[in-house]
Curated annotation (Swiss-Prot):
Repeat region (Kelch), residues: 145-196, 197-243, 245-287
Protein name as it appears in the record: Putative F-box/kelch-repeat protein At5g28180
Domain spans labelled F-box: 34-81
Organism for this UniProt entry: Arabidopsis thaliana
UniProt KW keywords: Kelch repeat, Repeat
Length: 352
């Protein structure tokens, strides 16, 4: 009988010791919980992200799903507006022979880098300035094609998938609203405002060529088809639309430009100038206003029959007593190397 109680007591002591050892093991082996960036409240994370250059956003979106969600949220846009951390971004759309859909690139400039004029030094790019493709995981930042009509801004989707959607917002507002849909779905359409109306062209399928171009009237909120410009323009790649002498000039990658007269409702053709013809081969691609400075994009035959796309930013100055504008090259470098058969489609400048 005594041996039974001794055994029972021995087992009890063993169990108690095992319990104590287990408790001590859990206590000492448990790692101290570290405070991570993502453990902070979203408001603080958004405030931090809003102070970072958007140049880092595409790479940050690859870190984790939480970052990706925050980076494409409207709350981040609101935070940037409140902090006034606006940035101007230059985008280009290129078409490559081995890809079915056009690719969107944005000009990336490494923050804190001293940029130089590599034209003078005849050097290759240091990588401080590049045209970086917008990754599919970050496709929500693919910019709208923006057209201002009066106090409103209209946006056309620049995604590869055709869409008839159009968006509108007041210039003082942050968020987009749905506008009346276009009559056909378009992929990367081009638009321009003239006489209080919005003209949209291109980006539709061959069987929808009747509505290749259409005009939107904000007053009546209705769309109206434009006359057929002819197969040469319909099957070409449109670069941009300009207004000159009350007519719309449609620039393409062909040897001629098309001109539309809204008053007569007729299309005509116009020969390209020698400068414009340089766009068809090796030469100037685009000129844009980049934050009050002149941005020039051009290509040049590089190694292995590829082409190097160069970019230069020029600061302009009008000197006293001289009726001339002087320019100083702030920096120039190769920003992208592409196949020689690539096609430049268009450029966009966003301030976000």
């Amino acid at each position: 009988m005594i041996s039974f109680w001794l055994i029972f007591l021995w087992l009890f002591v063993v169990l108690v010791l095992l319990f104590v050892v287990s408790l001590l093991y859990k206590t000492f082996s448990r790692k101290e919980k570290k405070l991570t960036f993502l453990s902070l409240p979203d408001e603080i994370v958004l405030n931090c992200l809003a102070r970072i250059s958007r140049s880092y956003y595409p790479k940050l979106s690859l870190v984790c799903k939480t970052f990706r969600t925050l980076l494409i949220s409207n709350e981040l846009t609101v935070a940037r507006v409140q902090l006034k951390t606006y940035e101007s971004f230059f985008h280009v759309c290129l078409k490559f022979p081995d890809k079915p859909n056009p690719s969107m690139f944005t000009l990336w400039i490494k923050p804190g880098q001293i940029l130089t004029n590599q034209l003078e030094k005849n050097e290759r790019s240091t990588g401080a300035t590049r045209l970086v493709q917008i990754p599919s995981s970050y496709c929500s930042i693919v910019p709208h094609y923006l057209i201002s009509v009066g106090s409103e801004v209209y946006g056309l989707s620049q995604h590869n998938d055709p869409s008839s959607n159009m968006f509108v917002r007041n210039k003082e507002d942050l968020f987009w609203c749905n506008a009346p849909n276009m009559t056909v779905a378009r992929a990367k359409a081009i638009g321009h405002a003239y006489n209080g109306k919005l003209y949209v062209m291109g980006g539709c399928r061959d069987d929808e060529s009747v509505n290749w171009g259409e005009v939107f009237d904000p007053k009546t909120q209705t769309w109206e088809a434009l006359p057929d410009p002819g197969s040469e323009l319909r099957f070409s790649s449109i670069r941009k639309i300009d207004v000159f002498q009350e007519k719309l000039y449609v620039s393409s990658n062909e040897k001629i430009d098309s001109v539309y007269d809204p008053k007569e409702g007729k299309w005509n053709v116009a020969e390209k100038s020698p400068v414009q013809c340089m766009n068809l081969g090796c030469g100037m691609i685009e000129i844009a206003n980049y934050g009050g400075k002149l941005l020039i994009l051009w290509d040049k035959v590089g190694l292995s029959q590829d082409k190097d796309i160069w970019c230069a930013v020029i600061a302009l100055e009008k000197r006293d007593g001289v009726d001339e504008v002087w320019g100083k090259i702030e920096w120039a470098s190769i920003v992208l190397t592409v196949p020689s058969s690539y096609v430049f489609l268009y450029s966009l400048l966003n301030r976000i």
